[in-house]
Amino acid sequence: MKTFIALLALLTVVSAEVHQFNIGYRPNMRQRMNAKGKLAEYEKERNELLSKKSLQLASSSSPVIDYEDMAYMVQISLGSPAQNFVLFIDSGSSNLWVPDITCAGGKDATCGSYCKSTPYDACLTFCQEECCTKTVEGVKVLSTTDACQSKHRFNSSLSSSYVTNGQKFDMTYNTGEVKGFFGVDTFCFTNTSVCATGQVFGQATTIGEAFAKQPEDGIIGLGWPALAVNQQTPPLFNLMNQGKLDQPYFVVYLANIGPTSQINGGAFTVGGLDTTHCSSNVDWVPLSTQTFWQFKLGGVSSGSYSQAPNSGWQAAADTAASFIGAPKSVVTSLAKAVGATYVPLTGAFFMDCDAVVPDIVFTINGKTYNMPSTSFVVSAGPGPCMFAFYELTAGGFYPAWMLGPPFMRAYCHVHDMKSGRLGLAKVL
């Protein structure tokens, strides 16, 4: 973990208040299980877990997110002096939370079970250094029965700037819950001057069983304040409100990379545009609502298939979902257009990694955006590749589409927090 912290915190200062730093990447749980030949077994266990939680999820008013699908992360710090954390970036939620010192009874962190089959170099990226050894099996592992044991945890007694908040929270995810209380302290992107004072954040005292399998500590929500539990102001909006940004933008660039963990999975720019990875020509799309980064998707096509409903669909940019979520009929038709085959046992679509297939074309705000096969044909170890789409059952509050990283790998996303719009810029 120390190596990861040192590398992920490398910073390039673009101007006084425009900063750019690396986004880390790790293949999502489905990709990792598929690479091990255990995707069917994983899906069976996961579906059984979800069925047990169905009543709880149906009655929950909190955003329902699949933590196991997340793949991109950044490093932040809280408190004075700084306590560092590695967090998933999630534009589909708006709260910041990390494990509290009382989670797992305040015990010292041990090596999580996810380190067991991790190659040495990747282990150094995502696990504590003492968990990693150069052996044939990979790394040594200390058993853990608590999801918090392998996490960095926030200790308020060590921070001179910490203030209590008094409010509690309970966030429901597809594969578990996160419960705890809110606190207030200084937030920074680690080893930078990009800091916001008085940031309200969640201190988790209990996290669901699925979280133990993930090396990251928590989540930083990039959505709008209206989406936040208890209406807390998200960190990026706090930075804007406190005048810490040159422009009210943050930009997400995601690189096209293979099925292995990477320090350089992309770039996260705050306070201005990303002129290194993204075209200077930005197409601005008005938002439908200021909750998700949600907008109207006019249509989609690929080869001979084309679909454009009269009223379009509501779609949201989503850094958390590794694939693209869409209505079942659309996913089935797109899969047919590119030659992908559904495998019921795994709940996923597969296709030839070297297949020459047409682009998938989206119509947004009257303009067309081509997504090449390099973005939606995803390698997941030996064997065929995965088609990076999944069926999304949406209703009511939720958009019909979640345009995840496959689309973001083709177009940088510029989030304008002041004017309520989303910019799309072609990746250079």
From Swiss-Prot:
An example of a GO molecular function for this protein is:
aspartic-type endopeptidase activity
Provide the alphabetized UniProt keywords: Aspartyl protease, Disulfide bond, Glycoprotein, Hydrolase, Protease, Secreted, Signal, Zymogen
Q: Which residues form the active site?
A: D90, D318
Q: What happens when the gene is disrupted?
A: RNAi-mediated knockdown in larvae results in defective heme accumulation in the intestine under low heme conditions. Double RNAi-mediated knockdown with hrg-4 or mrp-5 in larvae results in defective heme sensing.
Q: Which cysteines are joined by disulfide bonds?
A: C353-C385
Compartment(s) of residence: Secreted
Instruction: Tell whether Protease is among the UniProt keywords.
Output: yes
Which Pfam families does this entry report, sorted A to Z? Answer: Asp
* Chief location: secreted
Instruction: Name the GO cellular-component terms.
Output: extracellular region; lysosome
Give a short account of its post-translational modification: Proteolytically cleaved.
Glycosylation sites per record: N155, N191
Is Disulfide bond among the key words of this record?
Answer: yes
Task: State what induces this protein.
Answer: By heme deficiency.
E.C. designation(s) = 3.4.23.-
Q: In which tissues is it expressed?
A: Synthesized in the intestine. When secreted in low heme conditions, localizes to neurons near the anterior and posterior regions of the body and in coelomocytes.
Q: Which GO terms describe its biological process?
A: apoptotic process; proteolysis
Task: Provide the Peptidase A1 domain boundaries.
Answer: 72-425
SUPFAM superfamilies hit by this protein: Acid proteases (SSF50630)
Q: What is the annotated signal peptide range for this record?
A: 1-16
Instruction: Tell me which PANTHER family the record gives.
Output: ASPARTIC PROTEASE 10 (PTHR47966:SF5), BETA-SITE APP-CLEAVING ENZYME, ISOFORM A-RELATED (PTHR47966)
- Family stated for the protein in its record: Belongs to the peptidase A1 family.
Q: Say what the protein does.
A: Aspartic protease which plays a role in heme homeostasis and mediates inter-organ signaling between the intestine and extra-intestinal tissues when cellular heme levels are low.
Q: What is this protein called?
A: Aspartic protease 10
State the organism named in the record.
Answer: Caenorhabditis elegans
